[in-house]
């Protein structure tokens, strides 16, 4: 008997695991809140916020990662911010899982 696997949509992303979808919903709420607090008229503050968020691994699902990417692209457009000052976004633990050997 073949059971259909459930799917969960969050912010345009499709998840097959409920746990990941729940995490993505939490991250979506966090992103909404952060968007009200991050002042894009102050790139230095955006850079500090962005780097701290990356260092603390606040986001682990595509929902949060896409927000970080949006901030990263914004920062790269600021002429006086060095590219080397903008941390890369880690994705090794996407969905909160370690990469597993097959």
Task: Give residue ranges: language-model regions.
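Intrinsically disordered, low-complexity linkers and terminal regions
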Residues: 1-102
């Amino acid at each position: 008997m073949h059971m259909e696997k459930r799917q969960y949509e969050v912010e345009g992303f499709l998840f097959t695991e409920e746990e990941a979808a729940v995490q993505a919903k939490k991250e979506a709420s966090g992103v909404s809140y952060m968007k009200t607090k991050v002042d894009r008229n102050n790139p230095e503050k955006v850079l500090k916020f962005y780097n701290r968020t990356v260092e603390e691994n606040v986001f682990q699902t595509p929902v949060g990662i896409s927000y970080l990417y949006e901030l990263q692209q914004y920062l790269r457009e600021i002429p006086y911010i060095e590219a080397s000052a903008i941390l890369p976004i880690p994705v090794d633990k996407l969905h909160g899982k370690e990469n597993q050997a097959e």
